[in-house]
Amino acid sequence: MQTNKRLKMASCVKAAAMLGMLLSVSISTTAQADSWRGWNIHPPSYPNGKALESFAKEVAEKTEGRVEPKVYHNAVLGDQPDAIEQTRSGALDFANFNMGPMGPIVPAANVLSLPFIFKSPDDMYRIMDGEIGERFADALAEKNLIVLSWFGSGARSLYNTDHPVETPDDVEGLKVRVMNNDLYVQMIDEMGGNATPMAYGEVYQSLKTGVIDGAENNYPSYESSGHYEVANYYSLTEHLILPECLCVAKASWEELSEKDRQAIREAAEDAAKEQRALWEEGVQASKQKILDAGVKINEVDDKSAFQAKMQPIYDQFVQEHPELESLVTDIQDAQS
């Protein structure tokens, strides 16, 4: 009897030990799998949404499941200012941010909102992919945001109901809707126009009824909003070309091995290539649609006259932010 009891007890001890080992392995495996939450303001069908989904899939594959990102689209986790703070604190793991609203966090980002700071989207990509882009990335890193790659958001151009805009003088007297930003109000005013900040949803009817004469936006937005139906002169001023960043929270980044960091950087670079290509496809599709509708599109080959008109804006900006003067100059010199 004593022998049987000892055998039963030994069996129980072995079973308990084995169960403990299994639980340990299970807990260890769970701990190694890091579920990342990502923020995106756009719908999943948008170029950014598609590229971010590709990023999430590639990260999971390249890290062999150690990092499993999930993208939350349509700003369901908050608006951009909220998402910026959540990512800085580590409550969110990654996000795609437009650099326009980043100014209150990173003052250098305000340089990117200066009218005509970039001559073309290609110039913007080239500059942001190089040493100057690294400066912006360093500034963001100081605020706990690790930049992995740069996306594009198109080039905003002027459109109106009356005539092509080929020189700044062609803006004189036009009532132009702009975003509620002092830089953009001043941009139109410096060209002799009447800047009119207005809610985006009111623009179509205001163009149709003559409350305003024009507005400004990129090809896809001009087309999808239907503004081309009531304002059929689209002039490629490309006065505002804002980059976007694919960022990771510093807290999340510091938990990674060097191997996984490299894999995630590669996935982010692939996502940037995809986003840029998809954006260009969307631009071409929108352009063809508005051409088919009879919109008159004109190139603005020489932007120097427009840039000269912006000098008072630049002078005021540098006076208020003297520490950013060299950054402004370096971006301009890189396109000369």
UniProtKB/Swiss-Prot annotation:
UniProt key word Oxidoreductase: no
UniProt binding sites for beta-D-glucuronate: 42, 80, 156, 177, 200, 217-218, 244
Pfam entry (one): DctP
InterPro entries, sorted: DctP_fam, TRAP_DctP, TRAP_DctP_sf
Record-annotated disulphide pairs: none
UniProt xrefs under CDD domains: PBP2_TRAP_SBP_like_3
Signal peptide: 1-33
PANTHER family: DICARBOXYLATE-BINDING PERIPLASMIC PROTEIN (PTHR33376:SF2), PTHR33376
Biological role stated in the UniProt entry: Solute-binding protein that binds D-glucuronate (in vitro). Probably part of a tripartite ATP-independent periplasmic (TRAP) transport system that mediates solute transport into the cytoplasm.
Subunit text: The complex is comprised of an extracytoplasmic solute-binding protein and a heteromeric permease formed by two transmembrane proteins.
Family affiliation: Belongs to the bacterial solute-binding protein 7 family.
Protein name: Solute-binding protein Csal_2479
Source organism: Chromohalobacter salexigens (strain ATCC BAA-138 / DSM 3043 / CIP 106854 / NCIMB 13768 / 1H11)
Name of the gene: dctP
